[in-house]
Amino acid sequence: FVPYVHSYDFTRPELDCAILFGDGHWPGAHAHHITGNEVALIAPRTKVADWPIHTPRDVARYTLLRHVTVPEAWLRWSETHGVEGLIDPLAGPQFDQFQTMIRAVMAGMGLALVPRCLVQDEITAGLVREPLPDADLRGGYRSDVGYWFCYPEGRTQLHALQCFREWLLA
């Protein structure tokens, strides 16, 4: 394994493949989408009366938690739900890990937009809730970014890589 810092150099000989979060465009790499394009709006599981959110407009009353790799998330959300201009999409605490952001929501720090694949277990267990279950996309949105299986262009013929790719994408 090669430790992740901020990007991968797919010309490095020790790098066979990576799972990356982004838009699927990395120089020198083939990328296959895995998951993560469906984004969920999540709120603390407290009583609805304590966090009353009945329409997308109500979201403006709360602290919006943001992830550093998707700074446009709240802007995209507000455009999807027709409330652009009602929220400041750049205000609110930033996190660099989605799991930390989910825990912040669980602690009542605010609302967050998180890839559904990373928060579905917490939603199902009732640890967080989707405050707009009847809205389009259950209050979330479809994103242009997600998780991708990537590998260097020069490694497409590696048998082990082909087997792993087929298993992962099945």
Would you name each region that the model predicts?
Residues 13-20, 39, 106-111, 127:
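Alpha-to-beta junction loops
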Residues 9-11, 30-33, 55-57, 83-85, ...:
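Short secondary-structure boundary/capping segments
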Residues 63-84:
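Secondary-structure junction motif
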Residues 1-27:
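Central regulatory/effector-binding core of bacterial HTH transcription factors
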Residues 5, 20-24, 44-45, 97, ...:
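Beta->alpha turn/N-cap motifs
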Residues 133-170:
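A late-sequence structural motif
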Residues 27-65:
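Flexible hinge/capping segments at coil-to-helix
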Residues 86-130, 135-136:
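Hydrophobic hinge/microswitch elements
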